[in-house]
Regions:
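SAM cofactor-binding core of SAM-dependent methyltransferases
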Residues: 27-90
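SAM-dependent nucleic-acid methyltransferase catalytic core
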Residues: 1-17, 23, 65-140
Length: 140
């Protein structure tokens, strides 16, 4: 998942080091203290994996989807107006829904104070749906 502070660019290097220790010492449980966009933990091969994060948006979304995975299937790409309404009116939306909209539809994943970035026009004139891409990456 695209996420501010993402370790995606360095995931291959980080995973190689961690996986080496996990394999060498036959470690059964891996704890990711800063799961964020899940760019490391999703690549770790271990019997048990536990992801943690301090960001309540990430935690709300993870916990809710763990208990009800079909929720994300019902989400549609928000319009610009919907995005700003969700961002600016916290109390009007369920925590998991707010998290999904802000995490998946913020420009460059700048959730707090961010701006709409769910879709964009590519150089060849096509529309790229970052919201759907982020949602699908999260569901993996």
């Amino acid at each position: 998942m695209k996420y501010i502070g993402s370790k995606a660019k360095f995931a291959d290097e980080i995973v190689a080091i961690l996986q080496g220790y996990i394999s060498e010492y036959k470690i059964k449980q891996y704890v990711e203290p800063f799961a964020g966009g899940f760019n490391i933990i999703d690549k770790i091969q271990c019997e048990y994996r536990l992801g943690n994060d301090i960001d309540p948006l990430v935690c709300d979304l993870i916990e809710t989807c763990r208990d009800n995975p079909a929720l994300l299937d019902s989400l549609h790409t928000p319009t610009r107006e919907e995005y700003y309404d969700v961002r600016d009116n916290k109390g009007n939306y369920a925590a998991w829904y707010r998290a999904a909209v802000l995490l998946f539809a913020s420009y460059n994943s700048r959730v707090y104070g961010g701006c709409y970035g769910a879709t964009a026009q590519t150089k060849d004139g096509k529309t790229r749906n970052y919201f759907e891409e982020s949602k699908q990456n999260f569901q993996r």
